[in-house]
Regions:
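GIY-YIG nuclease catalytic motif and its immediate N-terminal context
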Residues: 1-55, 59-62, 70-84, 90-95
Length: 95
């Protein structure tokens, strides 16, 4: 018969962008994770990334990937593409 690999169930990875208001301006943060809900909770507490501590964050963008390496590559691109980040931020703030 057909054998399937044993192990944990498949979990996709996400690239996400967060937005927070800080000293009267909006700032963004880009990251990747395989548990978006848990990661947002960590960012909104003292256990998040150093940059995100002490601020309240909202997810304004997310994209799903099948592998960690794809997510890491996309995260790197989004972190460096300030024009795209500004567009995502502007589109969210228009709502």
């Amino acid at each position: 018969g057909v054998r399937f690999p044993q192990g944990p169930p498949f979990m996709p990875y996400f690239v996400y962008m967060l937005l927070s208001k800080y000293k009267s301006k909006f700032i963004s943060y880009v990251g990747y994770t395989n548990n978006l809900k848990k990661r947002l909770i960590l960012h909104n507490t003292s256990k998040g990334a150093k940059f995100t501590k002490g601020k309240k964050w909202k997810i304004i963008y997310m994209k799903k990937f099948l592998t960690k390496s794809e997510a890491m590559r996309d995260e790197y691109i989004l972190k460096k593409d300030y024009k795209l980040r500004k567009t995502i931020k502007s589109n969210f703030l228009k709502k």
